[in-house]
Amino acid sequence: MLQDAVSHTLRFAALVLLLGAAAGPARGDDAAVLTSQTETLKPYPAVRYFCSPAAESPAPEQLFGNPEAWPWRATGNEMANLGFTADHCWFHLTVRNQDNAENEWRLVVNYALLGQLDTYVLTSDGERLAHFSAGMDSAFNERASAEATPSFPLNLPPGEQRELYLKVVSPHSIQLPLELMSNPAFQSATLAH
């Protein structure tokens, strides 16, 4: 009798773990939150991604219209490092400025070897605010910034939220070391180099 109870308990625990693992990869944390104390933030818990062959990769408007229709996976607490792939990879994160007085931020991708990187900034209700291009395959006059390391401006007043989508296509390893930086922190880091 005791053995049956233990067996049933173990099966139930295994089922709960299995269901939790199946649900876990779909989403990261809801948002990367900027507080009054934030100058820089690595948003990995809020980042999710999926990759697909070029012919199956959604157009931006198709993705933005129904983002939950795609097979997102959470990156966890680490940066995405997908290795070499011919697939087109989409990344998503939500950024919320809880109470930081700084409006001007930068999304920095600390990896200069990405071939093509398109970044889309949307409001929380889906209105597209900006589209930026960067990467080794982009002409310098088409890039969002003059630095070799891609970075993108992000206007985010206190109390507001933005949806960020990044599309990466690269003949090199796809890594996405992200950092959100206040404009003063970004300027200071840029001057230090």
Model features per residue range: what roles?
Residues 24-28:
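Sec/Tat signal peptide C-region and signal peptidase I cleavage site
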